[in-house]
């Protein structure tokens, strides 16, 4: 059979050396293909099984991760504060929180910027000079002011010497408060934000914590004064022997079961008012301003009538007027400083209420005049009341509530009605003072620290809970202890205020770029370093505290030289001025950035300006995304 050139025959598949029939070849090929297919299928099946096992394991891992995410997400969503802002820029979708690292990042971003900390836009800046005058009228008429004024009498001063000290002290207060309030008035930012400028984005947390602690202490203190009003109200109704009728199991020389019960009554009565936002409480403050002056003047007239117009116009200490000039001089200094110590917290957080000023001048002249006048008047009422009561009872009462308690010795219907009515108004006054001066500021500051989980309402309730852990009955057991406590707090706060004022007025010439206050990018003016800390401010802060610290130890019972105590009596001036001077010296040798034209500390320039922040949320978003901190976007907006 011939063989084709290709080596294959058409009728049978044959090679030149071997011949294989077509049928056998097809069968062999088929079997070979089937074998290969079986092997491939087996491998595929094995891979599929292996993949299924791997997917199953992955699914279990993913399911476990999802369970963790769901648990963490549910906890975060349950506790986080809901954003009720009407600005669309404030409702930017947030990345889901899958891990604790995501939570940390979320806490960081909300700390830097949130709706409670944004600058106040024009529609919310409604305070005119009238509102600031009414604010200080309302703030001055409270029992605490009377107690501060009585401190001078107990130090050995007579009534007119004490009153002069009150005028001088609160004039200094007004001056320092105006200095502290300028940044809020012009840039419409709160104290937690303004403190970032001087101390750094992150070290300002410590500064805000100082303010929170003070707010909690004062909240507890005023709550206890309010509870003393409740005591008088109950005594006027049920009799003056409630302390003995109610079994005493506390065994504290400064507290009985009855007094603690009254403290809890007042504390619980304050809680419902913490639920409402600050703008809803304006009616409470308006009512307080309207009725408290009538109660104060009514009490003065009642006391003068009981004393038949006779006043103990000399000093109220045991030595009468027989005190040396040196002792008199230091008594005057301590009486003046008591006013500054009393205001150390409000001086610090003045931007919290001046940021609502309608115009540049709304908060300046009104406060400069109204504050010392209002406090001098109410202090005079306290001085005259204490002096009149001294002619009646021959006892040094430093609180008007102690005088009202003595009125109940003559348990007539008229005395009972008068004591109940005045005590009720004083209790309401303490409630309003606590809300405006402590609960709301504490809530604001706590919001700045942890805004994702704390708003003003929650912060106010936290402040109320902390106040229970403080023992104000020991703090208020005497005027000397009260004054000592005030001085102790001022040691720390005066140094903070000194640094902030020096930074704003001398170093920065009144210039603040508010965009940089809300970012922690490396180029931010107020980051200073990777830790967000201005070390110059920290060192100056420590220098301001150091001279007063020995006297502070002496005030709590440690034996220290008399010179240290005299420095301590001047604690606010010493801490404020030394911290400010130290900061200026450090900045002179180690300049900071963020001042237009690289102005030096010795240059005669003033760069302060009135800033409009109507679209701040949108502008900040653009600044963060496009402008960064170095492209000059802020110059377009501010310079």
From Swiss-Prot:
Phosphothreonine: residues bearing it: 54
Entry's Gene Ontology molecular function annotations: nucleobase transmembrane transporter activity; uridine transmembrane transporter activity
GO biological process: nucleobase transport; transmembrane transport; uridine transmembrane transport
Top-level lineage group: Eukaryota
TM ranges: 163-180, 201-225, 260-276, 284-305, 368-392, 417-435, 461-477, 484-507, 538-562, 573-590
Covalent link Glycyl lysine isopeptide (Lys-Gly) (interchain with G-Cter in ubiquitin), residues: 635
The keyword Protein transport appears for this protein: no
GO cellular component, one term: fungal-type vacuole
Subcellular location: Membrane
All ranges on the Extracellular side of the membrane: 181-200, 277-283, 393-416, 478-483, 563-572
Membrane topology: Multi-pass membrane protein
InterPro entries recorded: NCS1, Pur-cyt_permease, Uracil/uridine/allantoin_perm
Phosphoserine PTM positions: 56
Keywords: Isopeptide bond, Membrane, Phosphoprotein, Transmembrane, Transmembrane helix, Transport, Ubl conjugation
Sequence ranges on the Cytoplasmic membrane side: 1-162, 226-259, 306-367, 436-460, 508-537, 591-639
Family annotation (PANTHER family): NCS1 FAMILY PURINE/PYRIMIDINE TRANSPORTER, URIDINE PERMEASE
Cited function: High-affinity transport of uridine.
NCBIfam families: ncs1 (TIGR00800)
Family: Belongs to the purine-cytosine permease (2.A.39) family.
Protein name: Uridine permease
Species annotation: Saccharomyces cerevisiae (strain ATCC 204508 / S288c) (Baker's yeast)
